[in-house]
Amino acid sequence: MQYRTLGRTGEKVSIVGLGGYHIGMQKDASESIRIIRTALDHGINFMDNCWDYNDGESEVRMGKALQNGYRQKAFLMTKIDGRDQKTAAQQIDESLKRLQTDHIDLLQFHEIIRLSDPEKILGPGGGMEAALAAKKAGKIRYIGFTGHKNPDVHLKMLHTAFARNFTFDAVQMPLNVMDAHFESFEKKVLPVLVEHKIGVLGMKSMGDSNILASKTVTPIECLHYAMSLPTSVVITGCDSMQILQQALNAAGSFRPMGQQEIAALLAKTAPAAQNGRYEPYKTTHDFDGTYQNPKWLGPGQSGATYPQA
């Protein structure tokens, strides 16, 4: 397993991370635990999760898997939806309980997909107050955010934080062969993260299999492309031992792609990438959990997303 440094934190994280959503989808809970422990045994130390994944089942299963010494092997990340201080604090404590741990290595604000999100979180009474209090109490170590809708929303979150003299430790976003052509996080956001030494968490390397449906690239090409960017970790969902082995093979065989290889891959995917056809998380509400469940955001919050909010 290859390891990279997570931004300016100094933490060493595996080049591939285990996605938490798919862990809760597996019908057999014991199989989920086996996947998590096998990943850790093979050097994947970055564990992804979220307070809302599968009604908390993803965190519960990961919490069970991290017993018997496995917590010490993991760099554990989870996410919360709460935009206000009270909701965020409650979700942090619920995640800690489900994960059966006294601290989370990286806590991230989930689904930053509205232009109104940055002010709600970073303003007075916002969720950031809960995160900073949790950090002071030793419940969390680092703070980041995630989103999949539009790079301009990410930029607003970053610059709203900079204006308040706060720099996030990590940022998660789609980085893949299609993103490079449409509403690109790679082109707009990645340079800012590199400049400020913020950890880069790549997700949706295969677009939840949508990109594979374009029949232009293989799973290994997708993972190697994302790994060839200045990512700290490429997070991928594994709902079976077979898919986990695919991720391990990709990590084991990875060598940075040359400029000619990248150019050829992008040329191959360009026609299919137009209009975000294979990136529905950017163009539809299908991936917007907080749009469908605005109560997760906290009392009185709207689920409307970019560009409406």
Regions found by a protein language model. Give the residues of each.
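A general structural detector for well-ordered alpha-helical segments in enzyme core domains, enriched
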Residues: 2, 31-36, 61-65, 91-95, ...
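Conserved, mostly hydrophobic/aromatic
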Residues: 6, 18, 39, 47, ...
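Active-site mouth loops of central-metabolism enzymes
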Residues: 19-30, 77-87, 115-120, 149, ...
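Structured C-terminal cap/extension of enzyme domains
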Residues: 30, 38-41, 45, 164, ...
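Short catalytic-loop micro-motif centered on adjacent basic/acidic residues
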Residues: 45-52, 77-79, 141-146, 172-173, ...
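Structural motif corresponding to the early beta-alpha repeats
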Residues: 53, 68-89, 110-113
